[in-house]
Amino acid sequence: MKIIKYVLILTLVILIGGFLYFTNRTPVSPFKIEEFVKDSLRLEVNYSRPYKKNRLIFGSEADALVPYGEYWRLGADAATTFESNLDINFGGTKINSGKYRMYAVPNENSWKITLNSEPDKFGYFEPNYDKDVISIDVPSQPLLNSLEQFTISFEDNENGLSLIHI
């Protein structure tokens, strides 16, 4: 009877210790909220910021982390989400206010950016493409200097508001 009691106590200690470890550890790709507020408009992008770590991220090579023409969740861990409190014009098309899953299909000279109506799905798995709301093709440009960590930001300019992925 004492052995069963010790085994149960040991099992409980291991379970509690594991739970505390996994809930309190720093994620490898830190979570970020990028926000834009102007007048009554509020836009928000929630994503995780992976590091390059001397890896080939995009390319046609077999060892690229994200091969050209393949789904990418725009970050790491959970799906990247885009949220607007107002109806907006996104790439020339009106979209309703709300929260969307945002993902990309990178290519060498352009990226296809898509908003999907299932924002709460885990990002590793490809989305249900039937739930895509809008897809736009945007030109891509090589950076002059390599960046270590993925970044999404808003840029307000004379042409309107741009969402920049670096």
Protein language model regions, located:
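Hydrophobic membrane-insertion alpha-helices, especially the h-region
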Residues: 5-21
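Aromatic-capped interface at the extracytoplasmic side
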Residues: 18-34
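Charge-dense, helix-prone N-terminal extensions
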Residues: 26, 45, 89-90
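Low-complexity, acidic/polar, glycine-enriched regions of mature
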Residues: 55-59, 64-86, 101-102, 125-127
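Mid-length scaffold segments of soluble, non-membrane domains
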Residues: 74-121
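Surface-exposed, gly/pro-biased binding rims or lids
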Residues: 120-161
